[in-house]
Each structure stands twice: as C-alpha cells, then as structure tokens.
C-alpha cells in the first residue's frame, strides 16, 4: 500500500493506493501548525472507517507539497509512525519521464510535475493543455515531445471566495456551487451564481484564447479541487480529479526502480 499526499495551499489530499488504484482518499485542511502526531491521529480515524488495520499494509509514501512549512511535519509522520522515508516530488522527477521544463524560470510546483507525469502517461503522443484548478488555476501547455513550453496562472475558485469574504463587510459568506441560472433574486443566490458563472467564464475564456493562439491541436485535461464545477463542458476533453494523486504514485514507483 502506498500513501500519496498532495499538500496544497488550501487543502491536503491523502490517498491510499494499491497496484496503481486508489483504495480510499480524504481531504483535510492544510495547516502549518498540525504536528506529525495530529496528522497520524487524523489519518487513523479516517482510515478506520474502511478497515481497522488498513494502515498496517503501508510500505511507502510520496508527497507533493507547495507549502514548505508543512513538509517537516508530514515527513515526521511517515518516519515516526510508519518507519519509512517518504519521497518528496521535485522538478528533477520530471526527467525520469522524459519531461522538460522549457520556461523562462524552469521551476514549477510539485503538484504540476505530478499532473504532467500522469497526463503524459495516458496521452503520450498528444499535445496537452493540463488545467489544475486549485487555490490558483494553472494552465500547463505540454507538447507531444514532453516539453512544458507555456503556462497561464489565474485565481482559483477558493481565492475568489476568500476575496469576497475578506473585501466585503455586508455580503453574506457563501461557497461556490453549481447554479442553473446567473440572474437571481436573493443576495446569497446572486453571490453563488456570480462565483460559479464568473469562474467558469474565466476558465473557458482562457482555454479558448489559448486554443486560438496555439498552432497545435490540444487535448484539454482538467483536475483539481475546483473541477467539480465543470461537468458537461464541451471544451474539456477529460476530467480526472485524481490526476495529481496518480502522478504522485507513478513517480514513487519509478523511484523504486
């Protein structure tokens, strides 16, 4: 059993994987003050709902993190409670899969490395646009030869929600959720509709502009926490909420020879 951990700015995804298949998964809030013992307690409670001894089968772990302050706590979690040294995803792991970062600043987040590894494994001969809808929404352009040659970085849906909460005194707190129509007659519903349709319009607009500017025929892949808002979108060829987790597992297996 492999534990794949994706530490994002807003939430941390944890998945138990066996033979490349996700057996169970959980999402908890990302907190720099959470100790290794607290992580273990949290995971133990969540895992026990499936099986009392499921964690006994853990033989390895891999971590994608964009929150450095969390790294030591998660590393200690596995060293102290599982007696294993976890693999931290870095840009160098892209080389193992023939991927090249051809950007002016050739350093990207570990989650993006995992996304690109997983996407390229499934579509090895395609030019790809891989969209990760996390705290930030990142559009990755990967050519069929494995070169990451372009990117767009925009706000994520959680950033938009947070901004509305922080920058307005009288508007009610709300979440982004699907809305059938954009024009509403209540403040709460109007906020939800504005967040939902506004975010969708941003992603669709950027995607279509990328495709207009591109000389390649792009296969569009979407993942991340915000991807649940994008069902039935004809410009997204494939939606995979587990793309990052799959990439983390693939990188772990590759490093083990």
Curated annotation (Swiss-Prot):
Q: Where does K(+) bind?
A: 132
Identify which cofactors the protein needs according to its UniProt entry: NH4(+); K(+)
Q: Give the CC-aspect GO terms.
A: cytoplasm
Q: What reaction does this catalyse?
A: (R)-pantothenate + ATP = (R)-4'-phosphopantothenate + ADP + H(+)
Give me any GO biological process, just one: coenzyme A biosynthetic process
User: What positions constitute the catalytic site?
Assistant: 111 (proton acceptor)
Q: Which UniProt keywords apply?
A: ATP-binding, Coenzyme A biosynthesis, Cytoplasm, Kinase, Metal-binding, Nucleotide-binding, Potassium, Transferase
Give this protein's Gene Ontology molecular function annotations: ATP binding; metal ion binding; pantothenate kinase activity
Q: In which pathway does it act?
A: Cofactor biosynthesis; coenzyme A biosynthesis; CoA from (R)-pantothenate: step 1/5
Q: Where does substrate bind?
A: 109-112, 187
Name the principal localization, coarsely classed: cytoplasm
Task: State which Enzyme Commission number(s) the record gives.
Answer: 2.7.1.33
Binding positions (ATP): 6-13, 135
Q: What PANTHER family is this protein classified in?
A: TYPE III PANTOTHENATE KINASE
As for what it does, the entry says:
Catalyzes the phosphorylation of pantothenate (Pan), the first step in CoA biosynthesis.
Subunit (UniProt): Homodimer.
Name it.
Answer: Type III pantothenate kinase
């Amino acid at each position: 059993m492999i534990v794949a951990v994706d530490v994002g700015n807003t939430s941390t995804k944890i998945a138990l994987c066996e033979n490349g298949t996700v057996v169970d998964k959980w999402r908890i809030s990302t907190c720099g003050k959470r100790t290794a013992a607290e992580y273990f307690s949290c995971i133990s409670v969540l895992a026990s709902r499936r099986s009392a001894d499921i964690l006994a089968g853990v033989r390895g772990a891999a971590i994608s993190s964009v929150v450095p302050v969390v790294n030591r706590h998660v590393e200690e979690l596995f060293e102290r409670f599982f007696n294993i040294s976890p693999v931290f995803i870095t840009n160098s792991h892209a080389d193992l899969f023939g991927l090249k970062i051809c950007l002016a600043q050739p350093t990207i987040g570990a989650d993006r490395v995992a996304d690109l590894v997983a996407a390229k494994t499934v579509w090895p001969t395609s030019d790809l646009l891989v969209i990760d809808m996390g705290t930030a929404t990142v559009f990755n352009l990967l050519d069929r030869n494995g070169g990451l040659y372009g990117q767009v970085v925009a706000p994520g849906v959680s950033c938009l929600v947070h901004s509305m909460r922080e920058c307005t005194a009288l508007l009610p707190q709300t979440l982004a959720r699907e809305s059938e129509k954009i024009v509403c007659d209540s403040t709460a519903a109007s906020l939800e509709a504005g967040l939902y349709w506004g975010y969708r319009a941003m992603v669709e607009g950027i995607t279509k502009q990328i495709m207009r500017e591109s000389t390649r025929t792009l296969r569009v892949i979407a993942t991340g926490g915000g991807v649940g808002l994008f069902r039935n979108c004809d410009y997204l060829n494939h939606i995979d909420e587990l793309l990052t987790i799959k990439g983390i597992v693939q990188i772990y297996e590759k490093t083990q020879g």
